[in-house]
Amino acid sequence: MNIQTFCLKASEGACLAFCYIRAALGKVIPEKMFGILWDAADKNIIDENDNCYVNDAIALMKLANPNKKYSVIKKDISSLEELDGQLAAVSYKNGGYNHFVLVEKGQILFDSLDDSKCVKYGKPTTARIIKIEDK
């Protein structure tokens, strides 16, 4: 895939993938995060032809940081308080749209967009609770 086409596809749907990558890295490193996303598409860990659908969250986080052990549990939620402060990729829904952000201790830790209408006007609906441990 050409780089500009990949960028367009990533801009439309890589929010969950970026949340997993950010969780594994522990901080935002844009050029590294984009490189990991590219490698993940090359390895079929994400599907760039399906809104950057994450085929394997654990493999994606291991690609970002192989020195940790990861687990992910999906949970339906209606508020951030239900997460008890845990690290999670949370989907906010607004109308027919949704957007994932990384949340910890009830606060948004990372949002791949500057101004998400889903987060601003929507409600949290699902969470991917992320556990990270040393190997």
Model-derived features: where do they sit?
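Active-site nucleophile-adjacent alpha helix/oxyanion-hole segment immediately C-terminal to the catalytic cysteine
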Residues: 1-47
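Conserved active-site-adjacent core of cysteine acyl-enzyme catalytic domains
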Residues: 38-128, 133
